[in-house]
Amino acid sequence: MMKILFIYRHPSMGFSIGKVFRPIEEEMKKYAEVDSIYMPTSQYSLNSIWQNIKTTRKAINSKKYDIVHITGTEHYLIPFLLGEKVVVTVHDLGHYFDIHGLKKILFWILQIFSLKFAKAITCISNFTVQELK
């Protein structure tokens, strides 16, 4: 039976498209072994990012998953999951176009460049597809 891990951002981060994945996750349980984890932190400090990476690696090391699906904004996890079949859902890149300077460079590295390491990328809209181009 296929094993799938869904990774969700921390629940305190406000509205999350992750709620859309819950019914999908439940339906998939009919055909696959499905687990999910929530990130322990919602901040983007180095320490918080490191905590999220460790939590994700711990889950992946505990069981061999066929697919790891990052459902939210934690694209920065992808390079730390090399060797895994990572699917990521991109919601939008709106924030990227609103920031400047060093923040924009860091956002590009953590959120956009990281996508190059994903096995597959899904987008919630054609608008998001165009943003990625």
Go through the PLM ranges and name each one.
Residues H10, T73-E74, D92-G94, F127:
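Short, flexible active-site-adjacent loop segments at beta-strand->alpha-helix junctions, enriched
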Residues I67-H69, F80-I99:
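Active-site proximal beta-strand in glycosyltransferases
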Residues S16, L77-F80, D98-I99, L132-K133:
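Short glycine-/acidic-enriched loop or helix-start segments at secondary-structure transitions
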